[in-house]
Amino acid sequence: MVASKIAWKFILPNCFKAKNDRNILPSETKIIQICKQINSDHHHSRLAISDISTDSRSVFISLDDLSSNAIIGSNLHIFTYAELKIITSKFSSANFLGKGGFGPVHKGFIDDKIKPGLKAQPVAVKLLDLDGNQGHQEWLTEVVFLGQLRHPHLVKLIGYCWEEEQRLLVYEYMARGNLENHLFSRYSSCLPWSTRIKIAVGAAKGLAFLHGEEKPVIYRDFKASNILLDSDYKAKLSDFGLAKDGPEGDDTHVSTRVMGTHGYAAPEYIMTGHLTSKSDVYSFGVVLLELITGRPAMDKNRPIRERNLVDWARPMLRDFHKLDRIMDPRLEGQYSTEGAKKVAALAYQCLSHQPRSRPTMSNVVKSLEPISELTDIPIGPFVYVVPSSECDKELEIGALKSKLDEEKKMNVNEDEQKGARRHGHRHKHRPKSSAAAAAVYSDTHMQNFALSHERTNKKHILK
């Protein structure tokens, strides 16, 4: 094993500016032979970001080199900027999906009319914000990592665009957006407990895959907004711009400048810059807390003691008698008590101040999977909710439905009593009206019911 890094220029000499011809020394000949061996093994071993680091001014990786099989294989399609303008309708506001640290994201649609061999499907196109905090290096990191890594719980990178200053990435479209919006947006309905566990298991599997690679990958920016959900709430990790190659051999950590998101980063990483896979485990513990509590990692609108989620909630994770104090009130008790205890205990381990005390992500997966099979979830009352993006309307309709249920039951009881008195004892066992018929209501029923109550209230006020 060669201790020093092997210069990329020996593998792809056309990436570099021409230098004066000179004789190659025997030692360099040996390095070239080793590099050729590495190059021939690229289909077996993942290319590390450090191999193509652009820190040196003498290094320049061309588009041709990037698209060659020697770097990322032939998994990715290369799009022109004009093609991406077509599929996103010139990046129209109607197709705007959101904006992250990298830049804005727009929805588009690709098929074989754009490029031969393309599968017809919706896509998400991410455009680098030239005035933002990220740049070419983060874009290149994303291309290199996702160009080589394939897993059911990693978002699929379909292709990219590199034209002059423009840097774009084309991903599979994730219909339900990111976890952050589902948990914290006031316009989103409450995620059921079973869905939250499913998301946690999927995200954990994605991290476990990265950590278990022959050349480990440290995600470094694990958070709710980077967990994307498909139409079936299958979780996939996205945004690999800050990912780093993990330590290999006898190394215990990677020393790097502190990057990531406040509230999610592990304390030892913030203090020392020492990055390990256990740094990701800590971040996963924060997201587990968000799933349990329905609160974001940092919330300036809370009282001072509750602004940092970990500081507020972690002390209560070990005391199951206090667990109900931190459970998301929107769940309304509809969760497995045993499952909540197990998730709380796991989150407590992940958030340990000692990195060595945190579990590996593979063990996290083993702990979470059985929780998804627990069935001790209370059965709540049926509530009809009119599809709406406004939570206030949903709550109002739900309340109206409950009241309507009560009145219908009262009417049914009155009718039965009258019928019994009218027709005698032999009619007492007459089949009752179907309860299912009263379980579904149309929008019109709800509106009429609301209007009738409004008129009744007005009459009472006039009296």
From Swiss-Prot:
Active site: D221 (proton acceptor)
Modified residues (Phosphotyrosine): Y171, Y173
Reactions it catalyzes: L-seryl-[protein] + ATP = O-phospho-L-seryl-[protein] + ADP + H(+); L-threonyl-[protein] + ATP = O-phospho-L-threonyl-[protein] + ADP + H(+)
PTM section of the record: Phosphorylated at Tyr-171 and Tyr-173 in the presence of pathogen-associated molecular patterns (PAMPs); this triggers the expression of pathogenesis-related genes.
Positions of the Protein kinase domain: 91-383
Induction or repression: Induced by the V.dahliae elicitor EPD1 (AC G2WWH6).
Locations listed in the record: Cell membrane
Enzyme class, first EC level, given as a word: transferase
Record-listed ATP binding positions: L97, G98, K99, G100, G101, F102, G103, P104, V105, K126
Predominant subcellular localization, coarse grouping: membrane
EC nos: 2.7.11.1
Keywords for the protein's UniProt record, in alphabetical order: ATP-binding, Cell membrane, Hypersensitive response elicitation, Kinase, Membrane, Nucleotide-binding, Phosphoprotein, Plant defense, Serine/threonine-protein kinase, Transferase
PROSITE patterns per record: PROTEIN_KINASE_DOM, PROTEIN_KINASE_ST
Role description: Required for pathogen-associated molecular pattern (PAMP, e.g. chitin and flg22)-triggered immunity (PTI) involving reactive oxygen species (ROS) accumulation and triggering plant defense, including defense-related gene expression (e.g. PR1 and LOX). Ensures specific recognition of the EPD1 effector of Verticillium dahliae, resulting in a hypersensitive response known as effector-triggered immunity (ETI), characterized by the activation of programmed cell death to limit infection by the pathogen.
Family that this chain belongs to: Belongs to the protein kinase superfamily. Ser/Thr protein kinase family.
Subunit (UniProt): Interacts with the V.dahliae elicitor EPD1 (AC G2WWH6).
The name this protein goes by in its record: EPD1-interacting receptor-like cytoplasmic serine/threonine-protein kinase
Native organism: Nicotiana benthamiana
